[in-house]
């Protein structure tokens, strides 16, 4: 059935120009006549086409009827209405400019879009006596013909048994259900396959050859169904997880030679080294990729502790090892004494501190005029006298590196006048 002609000599006004009042609204219990029904013509409608919501068995002597988008009959969802007396058409806030209402209550929607799919409510008013109006609602769900779906993937080339893949059935379609097929059959029950709540997304965990596909998805609603083209995952060969072996995890700064080795060994892989997240250049002496498997550092400093990583690569990609951090042994550096230059008078307190850079932490000890005074970073002598004048030295020692170094200063304690302080280094 084609579109009906629009009613002649109709008045068209907006919903803002009409105020409807009713003293009493009761639901109408219709007599035992044929039930009002609504059908879509054509039953399958494609996007961009027209569809007529054709009303059957409409009661006679109706003063008017209203169409709403959705199941709620409020102002926000109000599309259009037809008032029989005066043949008045009223447009509501939900009117898009593509809807036409006819005198038999049928609704034509032109140039249908995806947003037009869903439930429509026909609200009819039946004349009662002078004190009441009888109202009834009829709902109808408009389904658009489902589009041909396609499968999008987060990764069409996963590593076998190592990587997860997300398959999505597109486009997202309202009022439709999603089905998935693998090898032409419904999905097998396995912990490696998991569907989202809407079934639109399929998650594959640790893809193996047994679940590589082909996969198809289907979009279905009550009037149509469409299935995608098949998609098969291209499994890449599994890469072993690399790891680093090293000849010395506790090298001495600027002394020990380090040799890092990336395992496992294979002629099929290229080896790349990383320091602090930056790739290290390949030595000019490396003639074959396999030779870059070993990284030689003639010496290492305290600023090169790492992390170090190695990566094995094939033509499809790579995989990095866990990081390795060195414990570089260094120091002690030349110590510093604070305060380094000061004057003392008899009766004052002498309070000196000694600092150095060292790994592991250095041992500290103090001497005065070559005689051992005490251990520790601080030296405190209360109420010094002239007898405390002399050569003060802080010595530091690192048992791991075997290195020892000292710093000395000469302190002169005077009476009423300031003493002289000079520094010397040994």
From Swiss-Prot:
It comes from the Eukaryota. Disulfide bonds join 169-217, 262-310, 354-394. PROSITE patterns: IG_LIKE. A motif (Cell attachment site) lies at residues 127-129. The keyword Signal applies. Residues 35-144 form the Ig-like V-type domain. InterPro entries: CEA_cell_adhesion, Ig-like_dom, Ig-like_dom_sf, Ig-like_fold, Ig_sub, Ig_sub2, Ig_V-set. One of its GO terms (biological process) is transforming growth factor beta receptor signaling pathway. Binds to the small latent transforming growth factor-beta complex, consisting of the N-terminal TGFB1 latency-associated peptide (LAP) and the mature form of TGFB1, thereby leading to the activation of TGFB1. The activation of TGFB1 leads to stimulation of naive CD4(+) T-cells to increase FoxP3 expression and to an increase in the number of FoxP3(+) regulatory T-cells. Induces the differentiation of a suppressive CD4(+)LAP(+)FoxP3(-) T-cell subset. Induces the secretion of TGFB1 in macrophages, but not in activated CD4(+) T-cells. Belongs to the immunoglobulin superfamily. CEA family. This is Pregnancy-specific beta-1-glycoprotein 9.
């Amino acid at each position: 059935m084609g579109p009906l002609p629009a009613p002649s000599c109709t008045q068209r006004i907006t919903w803002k120009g009409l105020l409807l009042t009713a003293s009493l609204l009761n639901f109408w219990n219709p007599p035992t006549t044929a039930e009002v029904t609504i059908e879509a013509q054509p039953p399958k409608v494609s996007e961009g086409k027209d569809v007529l919501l054709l009303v059957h068995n409409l009661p006679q002597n109706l003063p008017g009827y209203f169409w709403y988008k959705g199941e709620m009959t409020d102002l926000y969802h109000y599309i259009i209405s037809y008032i029989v007396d005066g043949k008045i058409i009223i447009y509501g806030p939900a009117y898009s400019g593509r809807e036409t209402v006819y005198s038999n209550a049928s609704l034509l929607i032109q140039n249908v879009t995806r947003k037009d799919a869903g439930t429509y409510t026909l609200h009819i008013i039946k004349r009662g006596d002078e004190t009441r109006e009888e109202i009834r609602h009829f709902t109808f769900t408009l389904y658009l013909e489902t589009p041909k779906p396609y499968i999008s993937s987060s990764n069409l080339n996963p590593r076998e048994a190592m990587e997860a893949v997300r398959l999505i059935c597109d486009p997202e379609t309202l009022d439709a259900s999603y089905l998935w097929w693998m090898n032409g059959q419904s999905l097998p029950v396995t912990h490696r396959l998991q569907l989202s709540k809407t079934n639109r997304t399929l998650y594959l965990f640790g893809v193996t050859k047994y679940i590589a596909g082909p996969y198809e998805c289907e979009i279905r609603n009550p009037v149509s169904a469409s299935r995608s083209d098949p998609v098969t995952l291209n499994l890449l060969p599994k890469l072993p997880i690399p790891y680093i072996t090293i000849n010395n995890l506790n090298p001495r700064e600027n002394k020990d030679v380090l040799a890092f080795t990336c395992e496992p060994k294979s002629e099929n892989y290229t080896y790349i080294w990383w320091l602090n997240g930056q790739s290290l250049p390949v030595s000019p002496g490396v003639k074959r990729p396999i030779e870059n498997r070993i990284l030689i550092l003639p010496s290492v400093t305290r600023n090169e502790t790492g992390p170090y990583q190695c990566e094995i690569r094939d033509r499809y990609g790579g995989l990095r090892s866990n990081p390795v951090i060195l414990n570089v042994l260094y120091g002690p550096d030349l110590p510093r004494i604070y305060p380094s230059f000061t004057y003392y008078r008899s009766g004052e307190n002498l309070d000196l501190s000694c600092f150095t850079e060292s790994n592991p932490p250095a041992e500290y000890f103090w001497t005065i005029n070559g005689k051992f005074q005490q251990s520790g970073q601080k030296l405190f002598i209360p109420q010094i006298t002239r007898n405390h004048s002399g050569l003060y030295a802080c010595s530091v020692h690192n048992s791991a590196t075997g290195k020892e170094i000292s710093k000395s200063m000469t302190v002169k304690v005077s009476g009423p006048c300031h003493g002289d302080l000079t520094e010397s280094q040994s």
